[in-house]
Amino acid sequence: MTAARNLIAVEPTSRPEMHLAMASAVEEGGGTIVPISEASGLMFADPMAADSFPDLIAQATNVEWVQLPYAGVETFVQHLDASYTWTCGKGVYAPPVAEWIMTALLAAFRDIPTFARAKSWPAQAGRNLLGARLAILGGGGITESFLSLIKPWDCDTTVVRRQAAHVVGATRTVTTDQLDDVLGRVDAVIIALALTSQTRGIIDARRLQAMRNDAWLLNVGRGGHVVTDDLVNALRNNDIAGAVLDVTDPEPLPDGHPLWTLDNCLITPHVGNTPAMGLPLIADR
């Protein structure tokens, strides 16, 4: 017998804060929380517990729909099964991540990494974000949200994506095969891509060399988009102005890693979206 569509399991319970937020959202939306053996849908409530999915779904007899908590689904790829309808958090976290990009850009252009580490009064440095030339890799919700935030700065924005369909708010949209031509013309390269076999290592030594030596690299996508050793070399040699990274490869970045030692590298610990920011957004969605 098929279960009623409003019977939803919220599992696992390993992250109580996320479990509570998602369970409350189900109930506010008119759903009923039930054990997975009785459910027609599963709200998966711990993005770090993908390995528990097979044992969990084995208890289900009527589940037709699985909702994943984050936009990134790479840890679940091996578990995807066409017999279920899958949805994820794509687009839900775009506003806070776009806000991180704005923060990172202003920090980079105003040379905050240098000033934050200074032990004595440093020389004046910095430049204006107003009118800057920016390349954004990826044309999804994060990029759209960022473009709305950056609009008052009157920047020249080039979105690089697989498809040529124009992204609203961008000065222009080009396809990935034009990336090499774009890199040498911009003041900052912003990575906001999903990680796939095609995008892994998209920024390597050759493409870092193609960037201007006064350009910044920002990564809010996944650490695997950048070849880390190549980035370390580029930063050491001042081939680019610097990097601001919210994601790294490996992640967490180990103590003593060369990236921690570089004055032109600013690292944040994957806080483009935090639980405090994201849980209300996904619960509302």
PLM regions and their residue ranges:
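Phosphate/diphosphate ligand-binding glycine-rich loop within oxidoreductases
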Residues: 41-118
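NAD(P)-binding Rossmann-fold cofactor-contacting core
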Residues: 152-169
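Redox-cofactor binding/interface segments in oxidoreductases and associated redox assembly factors
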Residues: 42-45, 68, 190-191, 219, ...
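Glycine-rich NAD(P)-binding loop of Rossmann-like domains
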Residues: 112-145
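N-terminal glycine-/charge-rich "phosphate-binding" loop or analogous flexible N-terminal tail
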Residues: 1-48
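C-terminal helix-to-coil terminal segments
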Residues: 17-18, 87-97, 114-118, 251-285
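Short, conserved loop/helix-junction motifs that constitute active-site signature segments
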Residues: 54-62, 77-82, 208-213, 234-239, ...
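Rossmann-like adenosine-cofactor binding region
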Residues: 164-258
